[in-house]
C-alpha cells in the first residue's frame, strides 16, 4: 500500500518546478483555522 501512495506522491516531470508550492498548499487551511482564533480574540470571543 505504501508503494501505491509513493507513486502518486511524485509530481509529473512537467510540474517539478512547482514542487515547493505544492508542498505549502496543505498548510493554507491551517492558516485560515488559526486566523479564526486571532479574529475571535480580537473581537472578544463573542
Curated annotation (Swiss-Prot):
GO terms for biological process: photosynthesis. It is a single-pass membrane protein. Keywords: Membrane, Photosynthesis, Photosystem II, Reaction center, Thylakoid, Transmembrane, Transmembrane helix. It is found in: Cellular thylakoid membrane. InterPro entries: PSII_PsbK, PSII_PsbK_sf. Residues 1-9 form a propeptide. Pfam families: PsbK (PF02533). The keyword Membrane applies. GO terms for cellular component: photosystem II reaction center; plasma membrane-derived thylakoid membrane. Its main location: membrane. It comes from the Bacteria. The chain crosses the membrane at residues 25-45. PSII is composed of 1 copy each of membrane proteins PsbA, PsbB, PsbC, PsbD, PsbE, PsbF, PsbH, PsbI, PsbJ, PsbK, PsbL, PsbM, PsbT, PsbX, PsbY, Psb30/Ycf12, peripheral proteins PsbO, CyanoQ (PsbQ), PsbU, PsbV and a large number of cofactors. It forms dimeric complexes. One of the components of the core complex of photosystem II (PSII). PSII is a light-driven water:plastoquinone oxidoreductase that uses light energy to abstract electrons from H(2)O, generating O(2) and a proton gradient subsequently used for ATP formation. It consists of a core antenna complex that captures photons, and an electron transfer chain that converts photonic excitation into a charge separation. Belongs to the PsbK family. This is Photosystem II reaction center protein K. It comes from Prochlorococcus marinus (strain MIT 9301).
Amino acid at each position: 500500500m505504501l508503494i501505491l501512495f509513493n507513486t502518486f506522491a511524485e509530481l509529473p516531470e512537467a510540474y517539478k518546478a512547482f514542487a515547493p508550492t505544492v508542498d505549502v498548499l496543505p498548510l493554507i487551511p491551517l492558516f485560515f483555522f488559526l486566523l479564526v482564533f486571532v479574529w475571535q480574540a480580537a473581537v472578544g470571543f463573542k
